[in-house]
Every structure is written in structure tokens, then in C-alpha cells.
């Protein structure tokens, strides 16, 4: 199951968007064009659905409803709608939520509405009679309420299992993995990465590490082996061995290059995610020759397992892959008022004709994604 369409109204700089999504999605646009805000739609839904989350915390950590809505003082609140399905039926599920401010000083988020559809049939429609008789119920979604979401639990699980990969790996140390791991979630991404590795059964962990090891042997000169070592004090860390290194001596993760650590974490995320995986500029710190193969690598690693990959990129090398279809690329087009619209690259005039003529998707969309005055940098003094 994947997200087949996402809609947003008054969300950050996305005033009104509705865009279809494929199993792979490449989000392309200028700096501050709305790509991260687009990914944050999925993070927001995840943070409502995940255990220990909820509407209030998801809104407040983003500065409140006023910080999230695009046009403060014009329209109160924001709205999000996602449709989920598969190849046979693209609308198996749909979830819609509208949020506005309420309370003293209008500080608290409450529901304008919450709706769930299953196979086109509406199974949740709030506010209902109980909400109208007790408005405080609108401070909590059914999505976060385990006693109220039994009828759409697969949707809850799907949202809760979405993963965002955007961390910078520098400063990654050995990880104390025994005890309460939940405290690390969302606060220290590098430690959360090691936590994720330790959370899976040993046979699965070893299998994934061997696959990552095989990729590293192809792209990192003289690379020989990747291992997860347990240290004293219930700590673990990644270690590598190189052909040119001192015989038998292992290089700890603190001494890995940033590109190596980033590639390891991206590969682990691709192998482990079965819901939506969000990758923010995966090309960072990677050699262009590696970046060129990322789209194909994503396709091959994900083709035999469920899930969807949505990534943002500025990279011509990544978008040069001939296997990328124009329908997989969504283009962010800022307007003069600070907002942005989104459209599939396949809807660009003459896009398919240019691709059929031999241009890559990147050559078609990247010139349209640059800032309107960027050429003036050549005259800046």
C-alpha cells in the first residue's frame, strides 16, 4: 500500500495543492520552495499516529496552528487529505483532517473535522453527536486514540511506521542500547539509527548488514567488512575493516567519513522501511558517481517489498537516471506571494516530447525549478 494522492490547504507555504504520487517520488524545486514543507505533511501525520504522539504535540512542536497555516488572519487553520491504495485499487483508504485554533488566546489546536474512508465508504465523520455535546473531544483525533480507531487500524499502523531520513551523521558515538530506548526517538537521530539496528532480530540484522557491506565494497575503495560490535557497558557501535588498514585492526564509526555513514544509514532505511520512507537530499556527502546510481538502487531494493520512497533533491546526477518516469517527479513552483504550487513533471508542456527526444527528466525539470533571478549571481560583487 502506498499514498496515491495528497492534498493540502493552507499548510505552511502550500496554499492549495493536490498531487498524485507513485511508488517512487522525486520532489524537485528551488531552495525554500516548499519541498521540506511537503515532507512535513507526512511527518505530521506520523507524529499524530505514533504511540505517545497526538494532535496537540504534533502542532505545538511546530509553533502552533498560527505558524503552520499559510495565510495568518485570512483563513483559520489548515487541512490535509491523503488517499492510500495499491495497483488494483488506488483508493482503499482516505484520511482527511482539518485543524483550527481554540481556547483562551486561541492557542490550542482542535479539529474542524476528521474523516476516514474505506473503499469509498465514510466510516468516520467528525464532529459527530458526541463531539457536539462534549466539544473537548475535538482536542484529540481518532487517529491517536487506540480505543476509537479499531475500524481503521491498518491506516494508523501505516502512518506510525513512516520513516524520515534527514540526519547529519557527524558526532555519532557508541550507543547504550539497553534500557528505555524511546527517549532517544526524534531527539538524537544517530542514536535512533543504532537503536533501529538493534531492534530487529539478529538474523535479519546480519542479512541487512551483509547487503550494505556488498554495496560499500563497490563504492568505497579498499572496503572489506562492516560489523556491529558490542562493547563493554551495554554499548554497540559500527566497525569497518579495509584492505589497506593495519592487519586485523578495525575502524570505529567515529572515524567513518560522513559520506560512508550517510550511505550506510540510507541503505538501512531502504532495507527496513515497509511504509513511506522520506529521504531529504540523499545526495549530500556522496560522490556524483554514487548519486547517479541511487534511483536504480532504490528501485531494486524496494521492488520486492512493500513501501514507498519520497525524496527531495537538487542533484542533476540523480535525476539523470533514464529509469525515472516524468510521473514520478513532482515540481515545486513558487509564486510571487511566497506560496508554492506542485505539479507532476508529466504535466509540463512538451515534457514528454523532450524526454522522448533524448533528454533526461533532470534536464527537463531542473531549469524550471531554479529561482527566477539566480542568473544575477554572476554579476554580484
Please tell me what each predicted stretch does.
Residues 88-227:
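Electropositive, glycine-dotted interaction segments
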Amino acid at each position: 500500500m502506498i499514498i496515491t494522492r495528497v492534498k493540502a490547504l493552507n499548510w505552511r507555504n502550500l496554499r492549495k495543492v493536490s498531487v498524485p504520487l507513485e511508488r517512487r517520488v522525486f520532489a524537485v524545486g528551488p531552495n525554500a520552495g516548499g519541498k521540506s514543507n511537503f515532507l512535513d505533511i507526512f511527518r505530521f501525520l506520523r507524529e499524530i499516529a505514533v504511540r505517545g504522539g497526538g494532535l496537540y504535540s504534533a502542532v505545538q512542536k511546530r509553533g502552533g496552528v498560527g505558524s503552520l497555516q499559510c495565510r495568518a488572519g485570512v483563513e483559520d487553520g489548515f487541512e490535509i487529505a491523503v488517499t492510500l491504495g495499491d495497483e488494483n485499487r488506488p483508493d482503499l483508504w482516505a484520511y482527511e483532517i482539518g485543524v483550527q485554533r481554540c481556547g483562551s488566546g486561541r492557542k490550542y489546536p482542535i479539529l474542524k473535522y476528521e474523516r476516514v474512508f474505506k473503499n469509498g465508504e465514510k466510516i468516520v465523520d467528525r464532529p459527530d453527536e458526541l463531539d457536539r455535546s462534549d466539544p473537548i473531544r475535538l482536542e484529540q483525533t481518532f487517529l491517536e486514540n487506540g480505543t476509537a480507531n479499531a475500524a481503521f487500524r491498518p491506516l494508523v499502523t501505516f502512518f506510525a511506521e513512516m520513516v524520515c531520513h534527514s540526519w547529519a551523521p557527524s558526532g555519532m558515538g557508541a550507543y547504550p542500547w539497553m534500557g528505555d530506548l524511546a527517549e532517544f526517538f526524534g531527539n538524537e537521530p544517530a542514536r535512533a539509527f543504532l537503536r533501529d539496528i538493534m531492534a530487529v532480530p539478529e538474523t535479519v540484522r546480519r542479512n541487512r548488514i551483509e547487503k550494505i557491506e556488498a554495496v560499500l565494497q563497490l563504492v568505497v575503495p579498499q572496503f572489506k567488512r562492516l560489523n556491529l560490535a558490542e562493547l563493554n557497558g551495554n554499548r554497540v557501535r559500527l566497525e569497518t575493516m579495509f584492505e589497506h588498514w593495519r592487519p586485523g585492526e578495525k575502524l570505529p564509526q567515529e572515524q567513518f567519513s560522513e559520506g560512508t555513514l550517510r550511505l550506510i544509514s540510507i541503505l538501512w532505511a531502504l532495507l527496513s522501511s515497509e511504509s513511506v520512507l522520506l529521504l531529504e537530499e540523499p545526495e549530500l556527502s556522496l560522490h556524483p558517481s554514487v548519486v547517479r546510481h541511487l534511483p536504480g538502487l532504490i528501485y531494486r531494493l524496494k521492488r520486492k517489498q512493500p513501501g514507498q520512497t519520497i525524496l527531495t533533491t537538487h542533484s542533476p546526477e540523480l535525476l539523470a537516471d533514464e529509469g525515472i518516469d516524468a510521473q514520478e517527479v513532482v515540481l515545486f513552483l513558487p509564486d510571487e506571494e511566497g506560496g508554492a504550487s506542485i505539479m507532476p513533471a508529466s504535466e509540463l508542456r512538451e515534457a514528454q516530447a523532450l524526454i522522448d527526444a533524448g533528454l533526461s527528466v533532470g534536464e527537463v525539470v531542473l531549469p524550471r525549478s531554479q529561482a527566477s533571478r539566480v542568473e544575477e549571481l554572476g554579476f554580484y560583487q
